[in-house]
Amino acid sequence: MPTNSIVTIRYGPYDSCGIVDHRTFRLDGLQAVLKGDGHRYVLEKTDDWNTVELIVNGERVYTCNITDLVFGGDGRLDPLCQEAIDAVREAY
């Protein structure tokens, strides 16, 4: 996939301390990895609980549980962020 492509990050609400809400703290690493690889991204809220989906050219290329992502990390040590960036690179 060429750099400077737009990746849509769809994320749903998740439960934290008994409160269900859309939060982006767990997406920090994913955003950093995408930006570091030269991609632009758009955050899009969805009603599906606990989900993260990466959409490239209208096609879902990666999905995972948002609570499995490392909280507030830079994405370098998070294996899910590495899987996600590999999926974006392989998208056409």
Curated annotation (Swiss-Prot):
Name listed for the protein in its UniProt record: UPF0728 protein C10orf53 homolog
InterPro entries per record: UPF0728
PANTHER family (UniProt xref): UPF0728 PROTEIN C10ORF53 (PTHR28448:SF1)
Family statement drawn from the similarity comment of this UniProt entry: Belongs to the UPF0728 family.
Cross-referenced Pfam families: UPF0728 (PF15092)
Organism whose genome encodes this protein: Danio rerio
